[in-house]
Amino acid sequence: MKNPKDLYLVHLSIHGLIRGENLELGRDADTGGQCKYVVELVKALAKHESVGQVDLFTRRVIDPKVSSDYAQPIEALGNGAFIRRITAGPKRYLRKESLWRHLDAFLDHSLALFRENNRIPDVIHAHYADAGYVGSRLASLLGCPFIFTGHSLGRTKLESFLEKEVNREKVERRYNLPARIEAEELALDSAALVCTSTHQEVEQQYSVYELYAPDRMRVIPPGVDISRFAPPQEKPIPDSVASNIERFLDDTNRPVVLAIARADEKKNLGALVRAFGESEFLRDKANLVLVAGNRNRIADLNPGARKVWTELLQLIDDYDLYGCVSIPKKHEPDDIPAFYRYAASKKGVFVNPALNEPFGLTVIEAAASGLPVLATNDGGPRDILGNCQNGNLIDPRDVPALTRTLGNALSDAEQWESWSSRGLDGVRKHYTWEGHVKRYLEEASGLLEAITQPHLITEKLRTTLPLADRIVFSGLEDDLLESDEAAIAELRELCNANQPNLGFGIATGRSLQMARALIEKHGLPEPDLYITQLGAAIHYGKRLVPDLSWEKHLNHRWEPDAIMEILDLVEGIELQEGPGRQHQFKISYNYQKGVAPRRREIQKLLREHQLPAKVVLSQGSLLDVVPLRSGKGQAIRYVAMRWGIPADKVLFYARRGSDYEALSGQFLAVLGSDHSLELKSTTSLPRVFLASKPNFAGLVEGINAYQFGGGIKVPASAQGLDPDHADEKEAVLAPDMEVHVSDGD
């Protein structure tokens, strides 16, 4: 491990509302236990002697509907820990399903921040699928180890919906599940370690993924801040908390059945009310306390929370639970520990009836408060109760069994005392942040010791093209080369007039030799660099100097011989022959549609053999297999980072589906009037100028529209939809994140 106070760790948690104190847990479906876990982990890591700085990157939100805290670019957490809020998409708050189209902007702004601070992290740790998408690319570009924690996985979510016989297409579109699952697959493949909280996550959730690798899984249970949670005999219960609960109750001396969860269907609070209401014993001898977030008017809640509260109120009325159920409207974050203590003081129990609970932080908090637990048998509570022995697991779908278990738990005083003391001891033994950080840093140390290559982009590296401060990229498609001579001459004149500030680059799927020949044949400007073979190679200048760092970068887990051995057995595809057809980092096949498997099936086949790669189908007849780390967009980001050129000074001429990757971030883009149908959905994106002309005439039109040779200004027609008023439901689905079907170039 590095010297004390040396490690620089970066955590990514993009969605939800995140701040250092007074987290608004339960405000919506995106601001839950994950947010609290990440903030507390970052704070705990910063206290360790081996750590110099920890940054938590999240999305910046400027929205009158939420606190101004979320608009602050930086928030100090103490001991060298910071929250850094990154601009991505519109200013307003967005639910996580609407963030996918803005993740490349988050990536570009994060890269700019690392460049500005002139420091590269030792480890990047991403939380949840959206951060996994960004983090895997950041770590790839920066050359540092990547850790992933999924928290809640898309395949599990999809399965739970399908069990309810919900329309698959509708669910996938609403929750953007194809993009989420693909991001999780790629994060699993890119991660040096996958950090989970429980063995159940590994065995039942991660194991169903194509790129699941058991040897990279690490179960490290998170901790709980024991200074906040304590039994009632050690900390008093504020009068305000007691009165907030008791104002609903007729008899405040009864034992309490407590549930604390956000108002979300997955939390299954309705089942708990049914279990309570079905029992005469519980109705007569106990009180039910439901803490399900804050609310003013139920009508003003988001649709999901409104549906849950409507159901709860109907059930309370159906079972006539008035006087024995408490439903506080508001509470402060600091009230949560007191809710547990209140229930413990009444010899009650805490119930987590969730249909699935990835970890179960509330279960640990209850145990740390001396409150016995009844918790779902689906998820993390299995491990927690196994370690602490302070309660029983329940089947969240079996209401009669839950009724019986509740009655038994509240009727056995000796068992209650045993569970209470075991919970207190178990938490201190298994769930402290000190223990979590110690194990976490031991694993991180192993990753750092395994690094044999320097960072791809080192802190001291500045530039390989000294004078260019902006760059234009174009492809070399056949129809693009049909441009009239006047358009090509104008492009050549424009590039020459703006030297040395303006660089010109080619980004193509063609070989370097063919690209050179076409440029000479058609009289195109002399490129300053070439990105060829779908991003598999980068060369600089007239001498065509190869970028050896990029080659080492692409070589990570690239096994072309093993790939060809597997694909030799696949019917309907055949290796292309001839000069320039094959490349060190691109395997090219002829593809026979109707005979060969679909591209997605070929991708799955390689994954099943633990061969990470991208499978690209072009023109319906050409199939390429390239390293997972390659791609036009990723190569352009690497070049821009290496040269020190900001993303908003990179202009990309897009015409084919394979160009999508370069349109969704902070690059400036020009869309030729003859663009393919795959790019139709991008015309509403910001920084995408729709040219009225085709071919190179469209590129020249775009360069002039952006005033790219001078002060650079995004024209009004390239502002996209008004991001602060556009309906977030109209956000396009993110494309397949590992391949972009194109017409080829």
Q: Where are the model-predicted features located?
A:
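Non-catalytic pre-domain segments flanking phosphatase-related domains
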Residues: 425, 429, 433-476, 493, ...
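Mg2+-dependent phosphoryl-transfer enzymes with acidic/Ser/Thr/Gly-rich catalytic loops
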Residues: 626, 633-745
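Conserved acidic, metal-coordinating active-site core of Asp-based
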Residues: 563-665
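Receiver (REC) domain switch/active-site residues of two-component response regulators
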Residues: 192-193, 528, 667-668
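Active-site phosphate-binding/coordination module
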Residues: 487-578, 674
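Short beta-strand scaffold positions
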Residues: 126, 148, 196-197, 375, ...
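Catalytic cores of nucleotide-sugar-dependent glycosyltransferases that transfer UDP/GDP/TDP-activated
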Residues: 1-364, 368-452
